[in-house]
Amino acid sequence: MEETANDGSHSEELFSHFESRSEKEGLPQDASESHLSCLKQDIQNEKTELEALFKEAELATCSAELLLPLFKDTIEEISFENRGESLSNLLEKLTDNERENINLKNKVLEKETYIQELSSLFQNEKANALKASRFSQSVKVVHERLQSQIHKKEAENEKLKEHIKSLETQISEWNLQLKKNKYEAVAMKESSRQKTIALKKASKIYKQRIEHFTGDMENLTSQIREQEAKLSETVSASNAWKSHYEKIVIEKTELEVQIETMKKQIINLLEDLKKMEEHGKISCEEILRKLHSIEYENETLNLENTKLKTTLATLKDEIASVENELLELQEVEKQQKTLIEVYKTQIQKVQEAAEMVKSRCKNLLQENSLITKNKNKKLKKVDENHSLLTKLSLEEENYLIQLKCENLKQKLEQMDAENKELEKKLANQEECLKHSNLKFKEKSAEYTALARQLEAALEEGRQKVSEEIEKMSSRERALQVKIVDLENELRKKNEEQNQLVCKMNSKAQHQEVCLKEIQHSLEKSENQNESIKNYLQFLKTSYVTMFG
């Protein structure tokens, strides 16, 4: 009984396993060869298990057939006393055994049917395996074709990668050239800025110099006017003295002593006049020297202006070279655009070839649509990503190059504007120099006219002195005749004469003070001229250090 129960449970397990296998067979037949080999091994194992179960069932039936006559013999040998009780038990056992035998026969029949079904399934699986093997062979052929196509595409992609690398190297070289051009433009800007700063400094220094010269010229004109006023005062004083002297001469024609004293005073005055003439000549020579120095400075400034013009010409040449470089860069941009168009056409050709290959693969791989679709999607994504990356990289590089070119154009426009401003400033400075030269010429003409007036005034004074000397000599002759008559009057007039002598001494001291003041003013003017010269030398040295 236990053996039959075990056989029933094992048969149920096999039936459930068969049902699970039959359910698994309902799945799509896309398994590989490894799955088929596993199925074959499972079927063989099930066969061995079923054969073992058949053997056990046959042994059980044989043992039951052998036990039936033994039971009959035992029943006959049992005593008739216990026959009533044991017969019922034996009959029950027999009925149970018969039922079990019937059940076993039914199970055997079921197992036979199950085995037949399994054999039919095995044959079906063999047919499916053959179909799968054939399908796998076709898949292998298609896979090999796809691999060959993939290798071709990889080779083409490698060629494209090498071409892209060469393009990247060219683009890096172009970027280096652009950086060099940027550095050169920055250096040009810095040099132009330094030159503009130097020009501004020079213009400021030149303005200060002009202001200083104008101040010096005003001071000199004021000093000359003061000297003219002093000379007019001295002339008026000399005229007053002459009038007073004439009165004295008229009153004291007979006094020889007074004549001698007057001669001495005249000699002193002549010496003073000679000193004044010498000082006037020295001052005129100094003024002429100053004018010559100012003219020399104007010549140096004109030379500096010519140098600045040459620097402007060099700057214009540099701007023209930068413009030529910009034209070259624009040509390079055009070449890059043509290369981009060529690359786009190549990418379109590659995409068309890929589409042709995809259509062929679709025609060949209708049965294996899922795998081919996934692969085609991946290939499409790779191609699109590659093409997009190349396009985006080239577009970004072109955009960056355009931005750089626009920045360079803006910088060149700024340089042109700055150069125009510098030209305007230089034109204004030249106009200022022309005005200053005209002013200097006018002032030099005024100074020459003043010097001529001074010389004429000195000549007139000399003539007047000579005339007065002649008059005095004639009067001396007349006085010698009247000396005898005027001896008595000399005593009375000595006191008056002493007073007049005191007055003349005071006037002489006043004249000496005026002469000292004039000398002091001349020394101041000389010191100012020396300071101007030192300042000019400092400006020249600073200009040489700034502009080389």
Swiss-Prot record:
Location of region: Disordered: 1-35
Domain of life: Eukaryota
InterPro entries: Odf2-rel (IPR026099)
Residue runs in coiled coils: 98-177, 206-282, 394-506
Keywords: Cell projection, Cilium biogenesis/degradation, Coiled coil, Cytoplasm, Cytoskeleton
Gene Ontology annotations of biological process type: cell projection organization; negative regulation of cilium assembly
Subcellular location: Cytoplasm, Cytoskeleton, Microtubule organizing center, Centrosome; Cytoplasm, Cytoskeleton, Microtubule organizing center, Centrosome, Centriole; Cytoplasm, Cytoskeleton, Microtubule organizing center, Centrosome, Centriolar satellite; Cytoplasm, Cytoskeleton, Cilium basal body
Chain intervals with Basic and acidic residues compositional bias: 9-27
Keyword Acyltransferase included in the entry's annotation: no
Cellular component GO terms held in the UniProt record: centriolar satellite; centriole; centrosome; ciliary basal body; cytoplasm
Similarity annotation: Belongs to the ODF2 family.
Annotated function: Acts as a suppressor of ciliogenesis, specifically, the initiation of ciliogenesis.
Protein name: Protein BCAP
Source organism of the structure: Bos taurus
Gene: ODF2L
